[in-house]
């Protein structure tokens, strides 16, 4: 499993607890110093958890990440205007970014069961950085967030749908009672906070 935008590791910690007894390898990607220090301590005795102190993008390099406070869940590569929420992303730090296709090859990863990605509007760039590996033949499930951060990054839900469907996925919205597979419609591009799951066609056929 890939946890992209791991923050302080709460999601991966939940997966670890729910998968006790199973042979699952977790790869966490967290570029900010404070969060990475936290997950380094939290998972220091875990043999099947690999921690990576960089972010995912479509190019290798460096960038500035903005946040309102350390370990904020709003940390973003886009300096968002959050005046409506009485918040200001007035702190920043420089971080490393990497394409994940190179990482997959370096670590000889053969298959990814699940990707959770929550990087405040930068999801499409991260998907592009997977190259040929962001494909339904290589990845089973992808959980991603959509909302106001996509407005700031100028990324539409339509672009995410098109990118994923072209690569063999069906896209479902997370609802209170489960997943609801939906065809894209323009009215869905309302930038209201929601979570989606892309499901590999081969998984759906099982």
For each feature predicted by the language model, list its residue ranges.
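Phosphate/nucleotide-binding beta-alpha loop and adjacent structural elements of enzyme active sites
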Residues: 1-206
């Amino acid at each position: 499993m890939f946890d992209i935008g791991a923050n302080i590791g709460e999601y991966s910690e939940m997966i670890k607890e729910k998968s006790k007894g199973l042979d699952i390898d977790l790869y966490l990607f967290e570029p900010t110093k404070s969060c990475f220090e936290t997950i380094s301590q939290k998972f220091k005795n875990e043999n099947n958890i690999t921690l990576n102190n960089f972010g995912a993008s479509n190019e290798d390099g460096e960038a500035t990440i903005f946040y309102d406070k350390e370990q904020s869940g709003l940390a973003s590569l886009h300096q968002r205007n959050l005046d409506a929420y009485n918040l200001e992303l007035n702190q920043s730090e420089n971080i490393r970014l990497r394409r994940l296709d190179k990482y997959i090859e370096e670590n000889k990863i053969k298959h990814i069961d699940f990707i959770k990605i929550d990087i405040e509007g930068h999801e499409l760039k991260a998907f592009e950085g997977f190259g040929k590996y962001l494909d339904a033949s290589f990845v089973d499930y992808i959980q991603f967030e959509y909302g106001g951060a996509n407005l700031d990054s100028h990324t539409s839900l339509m672009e995410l749908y098109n990118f994923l469907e072209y690569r063999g996925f069906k896209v479902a919205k997370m609802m209170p009672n489960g997943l609801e597979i939906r065809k894209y419609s323009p009215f869905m591009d309302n930038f209201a906070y929601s979570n989606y799951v892309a499901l590999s066609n081969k998984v759906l056929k099982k």
